[in-house]
Amino acid sequence: MHGRPRNASKPEEEAASAAKAVQLRSLQSQFMTNHHDKIYTNEAIELSTKLLEINPEAYTAWNYRKLAVEDRLARIEPDPNLVSAILDEELRVVESALRQNFKSYGAWHHRKWVLSKGHSSVGNELRLLEKFQKLDSRNFHAWNYRRFVVELTNRSEQDELQYTDDMINNNFSNYSAWHNRSVLLSSLLAQNADGFMPNIKIPEEYDFVHSAIFTEPDDQSGWFYHLWLLDQTLNVETPLLTSSWPSHGSSIILSGAGCLSGSSSMFTTFCSESGSFPLILYFDQAVGGVSSSTVTIDSELKGNEGLVWEPIPNKNSQVSCVWVARLKYVSSDPCEYKVKIRVGNSPGIVSSRGYNFNAPYEFVFTAHVHDTVEDSQEGIVSWTDGFDIWDAKSKDLNSLVTLDRLNAEMDFKWRQEAIDSEVECFGILPDSKIGKLTLARLLMAREAMVSDDAVKGVHYEEILQLYNDLMALDSSHYQYYKDEHSKAFLHKVTSSSESLSRHLLRYRDMNNLVCLRLNNLSLSRIASVEKLLFVQMLDLSHNELHSTEGLEAMQLLSCLNLSHNRIRSFSALDSLRHVKQLKVLDVSHNHIGKHSVDTTRYLCSSPLSNSELGQDDVGKQNPGLVTKYWDAYCVLTDLNLKQLDIAGNEIAGEEFSSFVLQVVPKLVWLDGQKKLGN
């Protein structure tokens, strides 16, 4: 184990091991009898002591001793000396067991339990820990127990931080000491303790960890701490609104279900059978408290008092990055309305980490309500024809600039300086896998903080090349680098209105839907969706995607092309269940049904048992098929599709096609063929 060769046992060692096993079986048999019969005599307790001296991992024996201690304490007078004597004996047994096996979970847990009784000297525990940590300075059990002991004392976190200094300077490879340092610093920084202001302390910590990284570059401990520091540098405590739809200054056209005959408007057109459209707020971190009291709406659109805001994707959750409310309109009442949204003017929006949203934002858009011209033709959506070039004057991309500039007003100066210093430092580091990865992360961090359009995006080519190098150097982590490469590429695409507009089109056959083409790019992950909330038609075909995670935020999405990817099951499409506007879905030529064992199926938010499946007519008529295709059933029943393509998958066939037509009754087109009766 851990690269150490296993040598054959000598005959005398095997004989000793066999004798120990016989003794252990005898002790275990006697012990279990005592435990079963609840015998807590001195002899029975001594027997458990002998058992634990041989096998400190006998967890049942530790539990037995807890019961025995409680029994003995209940039988004596409340004399502190007698209580201490009983508990001190337990500490002695634990210490003996730890000398046998320093990594015994049961022994450390039992010692915590004894100490929590409050009759033992905490000072003795710290002295004992120092002895143990000299034997094994990296043992995480001891460090975990140390944190527990320190909480029971008046020892300051600053003193403990100094202790980690000493342990790290003695051994840079002490991962547990680095971890404890991050725990202590997190607490001290959160308290704004004297001498622990982030803009001063974090740059100092970068200098501290450099000693470890450049002295022992092949050891991972310092690198992990550096990654933690980078996270602290990037994370702004106060949550920020990163995007919204509609965006500030935009105009949208609203109608009922159907078409706007001859519509050539460059405004975003939204057609809805329900007579409502989504308002989307996207925060940089999960927040709660988004409600009609914290987000106010001024509009002449009737029936929108007390709007209900829901978190996406989980309605049962109290926090999310994405919040959606639906604003009602009457398509039979054509008119133009100004809508003003104020976010955070009243307190109440709070991040999952407990920080208040204190960057109020106001945006105004115009809603043009039009009559609907019913279209009796249910034409098939083509992904090759009917597209027009993007109008550079469109205001749909306003939010890319507006909110970026607003958030740039936050105090990022010291953070930018820290990142710049690290980029300069690691830019001269000799080539190594971890060095290249760290430099790529630092350059991504620098891009995240840039607000000046003149310099924004200049590092992406270098970042992409670094991940290309890593994929070639380190095949065992290829998929991770591939995913990071995809995320960096999408950040590059969405970094400016100019770069994003190169991938945008209008689909004239459906009210000039906004179409984003990201096909044939070898993407394996979806990212930057906060910049794509206005997209209605998305082409992700001919990539290497395994799931649709992230697309749940794109509430306007009505057409999605995922053909020729690497999707292995319908559970990988689970996020689409929250995109209620989706009408056209192409998942042809994927790997659905190809793998007999697919663990991703269990990521799907499925019913707890088959008895909860198929309570509708389809489930009652075909319970066997619902059970067989339960993940497809769960996803498809939540969608309102009119066009679906599944050809080229292992699952495709007459049986599954028949099942789909029953599950999605409004489906008109299946694999390019029009459903009979339509």
From Swiss-Prot:
Catalytic activity: geranylgeranyl diphosphate + L-cysteinyl-[protein] = S-geranylgeranyl-L-cysteinyl-[protein] + diphosphate
Pfam families in alphabetical order: LRR_6, PPTA
EC numbers for this chain: 2.5.1.60
UniProt LRR repeat ranges: 510-532, 533-554, 555-578, 580-604, 638-663
Biological process (GO), any one: protein geranylgeranylation
Gene3D superfamilies, sorted: Protein prenylyltransferase, Ribonuclease Inhibitor
GO annotations of cellular component type: Rab-protein geranylgeranyltransferase complex
PFTA repeats: 40-74, 86-120, 121-155, 156-190, 201-235
Keywords (A to Z) from UniProt: Leucine-rich repeat, Prenyltransferase, Repeat, Transferase
GO molecular function terms listed in the Swiss-Prot or TrEMBL record: Rab geranylgeranyltransferase activity
Regulation acting on activity, per entry: The enzymatic reaction requires the aid of the Rab escort protein REP.
Coiled-coil residue windows: none
Domain of life: Eukaryota
Protein's job: Catalyzes the transfer of a geranylgeranyl moiety from geranylgeranyl diphosphate to both cysteines of Rab proteins with the C-terminal sequence -CCXX, CXXX, -XCCX and -XCXC, such as RABA1A, RABA2A, RABF2A and RABG2. In vitro, can prenylate PGGTI targets with the C-terminal Cys-aliphatic-aliphatic-X (CaaX) with leucine in the terminal position. Substrates with the C-terminal sequence -CSIL such as ARAC11/ROP1 or GG2/AGG2 are prenylated independently of REP and when the alpha subunit is associated with a beta subunit (RGTB1 or RGTB2).
Family statement: Belongs to the protein prenyltransferase subunit alpha family.
Subunit structure: Heterotrimer composed of the alpha subunit RGTA, the beta subunit RGTB and REP; within this trimer, RGTA and RGTB form the catalytic component, while REP mediates peptide substrate binding.
Name of this protein: Geranylgeranyl transferase type-2 subunit alpha 1
Organism field: Arabidopsis thaliana
